[in-house]
């Protein structure tokens, strides 16, 4: 995640802040980043497919912090992956599987302390886990959205639309997408580091990011390596800065690199750069105002009028469900997109990967599976049917008295109170 080495170069403009600074404002939250952080406490359960509410507990604790500070959260979850990111996702998936094998071997050998380290490295954050948080958000009227694809451009889009005033995330990629205010390293006391795009001009001469155009900034991260490119061997962000300051066009940069023996790049790099430029600028996002799929920035007519360019850009911004056919296709005209389907995805009702099946809460799914096994192993079918009609989890096992304080009538009214909370009953989120 992020651009290797970028944040250290921005140290001069990183400000120690308290979230009190954002009182009465709305901040976007990178949902998967919080899920990754939360998974450390329940990695064994997640990898071994056992029920757990620990990742929900983490969210509740953080949301209580924001509520005390009178900050309104807007949680953004990742959707489907992009073709342009396949190499990154494949590498990560392979590494997770390797770590899972090591973890299980260590666990079987009785070395459980070291096994936990590898369990944490093998956790795969899933839409079903996000659904658990979504159900909680619905219960407490907390704004959220599932991005059609990546959360980063979705959060930047919300910022561009004025729906949020900052983004809480650990991902420096957000700056390349155009994030104006990035809040990182948030701790349990509400302290964090703030990086503002307006402060780029205050960076030192050896890293004058404020002097670069947006295209040069994209060239820099492509050379140094990002989620969309493998980068150039031995080129970090500092060396990349020197290169882009000398040559403004990527084609000139690559020509010069080909002439030198010190640097080299893979055959696929040129195409990776082209795809990265499209992905950073025109990714699909969901507009919560119009309830329609759109793009982070408007795609130029020069691109939409070229069949060859349309084929390229679709690999970078994602295919969508076509209106009428209900089939997932490379649709460029927004009028031909089934926006109702994508609205259901954005609300967490449909699975963001297959864009068709119902998205089910992870814990609810595990409970249903357990009840199904009980029904198969014994008991009358009628009694089994009666069982599954009951709540799948006793919410008192999930929500402690401290957590239920979110519904306390004396608490800040920053959140709307649900009818269930007013009546004193809390419906099951699992």
Curated annotation (Swiss-Prot):
EC number, UniProt record: 3.1.-.-
Pfam families: XPG_I, XPG_N
Region described as I-domain: spans on this chain: 114-247
Database matches in SUPFAM superfamilies: 5' to 3' exonuclease, C-terminal subdomain (SSF47807), PIN domain-like (SSF88723)
Cofactor binding note: Binds 2 magnesium ions per subunit. They probably participate in the reaction catalyzed by the enzyme. May bind an additional third magnesium ion after substrate binding.
Binding site for Mg(2+) 2: 171, 173, 227
Cofactor(s), by name: Mg(2+)
Source organism, top-level taxon: Eukaryota
Positions of the UniProt region annotated as N-domain: 1-96
GO molecular function: 5'-3' DNA exonuclease activity; 5'-flap endonuclease activity; DNA binding; metal ion binding
Gene Ontology BP terms: DNA double-strand break processing; DNA repair
Cellular compartments per GO CC: mitochondrion; nucleus
Keywords for this protein: DNA damage, DNA repair, Endonuclease, Hydrolase, Magnesium, Metal-binding, Nuclease, Nucleus
Binding locations of Mg(2+) 1: 30, 78, 150, 152
Main enzyme class: hydrolase
Compartment(s) of residence: Nucleus
Presence of the UniProt keyword Magnesium in the record: yes
Family affiliation: Belongs to the XPG/RAD2 endonuclease family.
Function, as annotated: 5'->3' double-stranded DNA exonuclease.
Protein name: DNA damage-inducible protein DIN7
């Amino acid at each position: 995640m992020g651009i290797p080495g970028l944040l250290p170069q921005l140290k001069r403009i990183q400000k120690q802040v308290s979230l009190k600074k954002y009182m009465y404002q709305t901040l976007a939250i990178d949902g998967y980043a919080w899920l990754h952080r939360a998974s450390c406490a329940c990695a064994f359960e997640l990898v071994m497919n056992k029920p757990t509410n620990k990742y929900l507990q983490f969210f509740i604790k953080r949301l209580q912090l924001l509520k005390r500070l009178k900050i309104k959260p807007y949680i953004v979850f990742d959707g489907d992956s992009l073709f342009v990111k396949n190499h990154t996702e494949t590498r990560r998936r392979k590494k997770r599987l390797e770590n899972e094998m090591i973890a299980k071997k260590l666990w079987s050998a009785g070395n459980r302390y070291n096994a936990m380290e590898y369990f944490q490295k093998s956790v795969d954050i899933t839409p079903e886990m996000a659904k658990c948080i979504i159900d909680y958000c619905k219960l407490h009227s907390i704004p959220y959205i599932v991005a059609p694809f990546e959360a980063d451009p979705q959060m930047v889009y919300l910022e561009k639309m004025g729906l949020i005033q900052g983004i809480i995330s650990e991902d420096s990629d957000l700056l390349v997408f155009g994030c104006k205010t990035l809040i990182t390293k948030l701790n349990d006391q509400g302290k964090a580091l703030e990086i503002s795009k307006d402060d780029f001009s205050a960076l030192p001469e050896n890293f004058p990011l404020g002097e670069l155009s947006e295209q040069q900034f994209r060239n820099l991260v492509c050379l140094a390596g990002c989620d969309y490119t493998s980068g150039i061997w031995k080129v970090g962000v500092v060396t990349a800065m020197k290169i882009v300051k000398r040559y403004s066009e990527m084609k000139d940069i690559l020509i010069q690199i080909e002439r030198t023996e010190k640097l080299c790049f893979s055959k696929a790099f040129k195409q990776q750069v082209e795809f990265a430029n499209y992905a950073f600028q025109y990714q699909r996002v969901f507009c919560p105002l119009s309830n329609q799929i759109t793009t982070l920035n408007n795609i130029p007519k020069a691109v939409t009028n070229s069949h060859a360019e349309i084929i390229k850009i679709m690999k970078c911004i994602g295919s969508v469900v076509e209106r009428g056919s209900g089939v997932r296709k490379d649709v460029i005209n927004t009028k031909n997109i089934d926006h109702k389907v994508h609205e259901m995805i954005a609300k967490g009702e449909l699975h963001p990967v297959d864009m068709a099946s119902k998205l089910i809460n992870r814990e609810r799914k595990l409970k249903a599976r357990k009840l199904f096994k009980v029904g198969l192993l014994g008991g009358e079918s009628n009694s089994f049917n009666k069982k599954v009609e009951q709540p799948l989890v006793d919410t008192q096992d999930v929500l402690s008295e401290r957590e239920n304080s979110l519904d306390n009538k004396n608490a800040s009214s920053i959140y709307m109170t649900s009818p269930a909370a007013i009546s004193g009953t809390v419906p099951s989120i699992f």
